[in-house]
């Protein structure tokens, strides 16, 4: 019998009295469930991405909302066909979002609903700022958004300084967005510290916008840090036209792969034809390399984990598994 699964995205910024106890309780609960996840908990809150068999996911949501520290948490839910993380990971992380500097999160931009966001986009009055990494917005973003060429979130504090020099903070209203909302909690506070007076953030991020408004003013797909790699923001509109191009032949494509050359492992966009021709590699040079993972079109573009590296040799070349940057 076919099983239905949920993908959950959620976070909460607020004091957590005993994060290690919460971690232990999570792990104990998950022992009896058909789930996979990547959850970080600290004294400042929780940042979670979760997948699970529907009854188990519903049980977990009800359980978490009964925890005193997490009663106000909001879940964003998508229907999926299987678990989308390699394992259950619940761990302590002091910085829920790796910004690299401290900010006063008690002072944040104004949260606006997906409906309000959609209306403001049509006013064309604000600077619309994408605060995700460049490889994320490359396959999807809002119309007319400013797309910083940033590889990691730790580069955004320097970008904020540049933004304050290029635009008058007192006169430039800013609307910012990220995948699920958590990065905006920090970056909106940072822009306020830089002197920006009118700062808005999309409540629940792009995920919430898609659930409420459909495709709307969004173009392309949404990059996600799980086995799907990318997803349409509207479940009812899965056939989204690519806005990116294959890095090898320049045809339209929005599919990311990790290079099958284990000494490269580069994340790149590729079409079906080129990925087959180059055996899962990002270049002709890599396709001739000595340590190549076996490529299978049936496996699709799921990210490679440690267990997939160098199946015929000692796993001395294991590369660091890409850690999820909070949404």
From Swiss-Prot:
Catalysed reactions, semicolon-separated: uridine(34) in tRNA + AH2 + O2 = 5-hydroxyuridine(34) in tRNA + A + H2O
Residues at the catalytic site: 178
Keywords, sorted A to Z: Oxidoreductase, tRNA processing
CDD domains: RHOD_YceA (cd01518)
Keyword Oxidoreductase recorded: yes
Residues in coiled coil: none
Function according to Swiss-Prot or TrEMBL: Catalyzes oxygen-dependent 5-hydroxyuridine (ho5U) modification at position 34 in tRNAs.
Name listed for the protein in its UniProt record: tRNA uridine(34) hydroxylase
């Amino acid at each position: 019998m076919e099983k239905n699964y949920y993908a959950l995205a959620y976070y909460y910024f607020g004091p957590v009295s005993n994060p290690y106890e919460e971690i232990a309780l999570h792990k104990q609960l998950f022992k009896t469930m058909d789930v996979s996840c990547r959850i970080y908990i600290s004294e400042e809150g929780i940042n979670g991405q979760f997948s699970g068999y529907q009854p188990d996911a519903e049980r977990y949501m009800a359980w978490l909302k009964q925890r005193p520290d997490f009663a106000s948490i909001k879940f964003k839910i998508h229907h999926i066909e299987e678990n989308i993380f390699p394992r259950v990971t619940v761990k302590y992380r002091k910085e829920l979002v790796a910004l690299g500097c401290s900010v006063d999160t008690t002072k944040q931009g104004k949260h606006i609903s997906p409906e309000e966001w959609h209306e403001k986009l049509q006013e064309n009055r604000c600077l619309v700022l994408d605060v995700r990494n460049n490889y994320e917005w490359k396959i999807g973003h809002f119309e007319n958004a400013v797309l910083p060429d940033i590889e990691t979130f730790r580069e955004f504090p320097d970008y904020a300084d540049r933004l304050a020099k290029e635009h008058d903070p007192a006169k430039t209203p800013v609307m910012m967005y990220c995948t699920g909302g958590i990065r905006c909690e920090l970056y909106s506070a940072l822009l306020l510290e830089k002197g920006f007076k009118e700062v808005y953030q999309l409540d629940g991020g792009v995920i919430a916008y898609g659930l409420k408004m459909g495709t709307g003013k969004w173009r392309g797909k949404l990059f996600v840090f799980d086995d799907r790699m990318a997803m349409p923001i509207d479940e009812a509109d899965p056939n989204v036209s690519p806005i990116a191009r294959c890095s090898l032949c320049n045809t339209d494509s929005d599919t990311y792969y990790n290079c099958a050359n284990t000494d490269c492992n580069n994340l790149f966009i590729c079409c079906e034809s080129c990925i087959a021709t180059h055996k899962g590699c990002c270049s002709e040079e890599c396709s001739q390399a000595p340590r190549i993972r076996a490529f299978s079109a049936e496996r699709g573009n799921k990210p490679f984990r440690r267990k997939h590296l160098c199946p015929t040799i000692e796993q001395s070349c294991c590369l660091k598994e890409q850690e999820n940057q909070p949404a």
